[in-house]
Amino acid sequence: MTDILPQEVWLANFPFAEDETQSKNRPVIVLDVDDETCSVFSMKVTSKKPYSEFEIELFDWAEIPLDHISTAVASQVIEISKSKFIKRIGRLSNDDWENVNDLHNRYLKSIGQIF
C-alpha cells in the first residue's frame, strides 16, 4: 500500500458512531499516522452547509478532487487501522489544512483534551 500521510484525503471504511459494527466507505482527512493506525476526520459529502460549530466546509473541495461540497466533522475524529484505507483521493489545500487543524484544536479544547 502507498504511504498514508497527514493532509491527504482517502476513501476508507469508516464505522458509524452509533453502531461501530456498521460502517460505510467515505472520504476521510488524515490528521496523524503511526505504525498501524491513522487519526482521521469524518468528512460528510453533502451539499448542506455545516450546522455545528465543530464542522467546517472545505473551500477547495474540487481540487482534491471530490464530487460535492464537503464538510469536515471534528466531533468524529477517530483512529482507524491502515487496513481500512481503500484508495488515495487527493490532498487538502494548505488553507483547508490550516482550517481543519484549527477546528480540531477548538474541538479538543471544548471537551477538555487540551488547554
Put a short name on every predicted segment:
Residues 61-115:
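C-terminal terminal-subdomain/extension
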Residues 18-25, 30-63:
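Compact nucleic-acid interaction/catalytic patches
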